[in-house]
Amino acid sequence: MAVKRSTRLGCNECSEINYLTFKNVKKNPEKLALNKFCSRCRKVVLHKEVKRK
């Protein structure tokens, strides 16, 4: 069975956490980075995986 863990994506410019997604930790051990819309910046910017607390 695949191990999927929830990950949070934070804006690279304003550091706000905007998205929650799931990824397979065994297949993709590196950090996730996606271009997404930030409602605070009001533009499409890079969102990177934020460290879990």
From Swiss-Prot:
GO terms for molecular function: structural constituent of ribosome. Gene3D superfamilies: Ribosomal protein L33 (2.20.28.120). One of its GO terms (cellular component) is cytoplasm. Keywords: Ribonucleoprotein, Ribosomal protein. One of its GO terms (biological process) is translation. It comes from the Bacteria. Belongs to the bacterial ribosomal protein bL33 family. This is Large ribosomal subunit protein bL33A. The lineage of its organism: Bacteria, Bacillati, Mycoplasmatota, Mycoplasmoidales, Mycoplasmoidaceae. The gene is rpmG1.
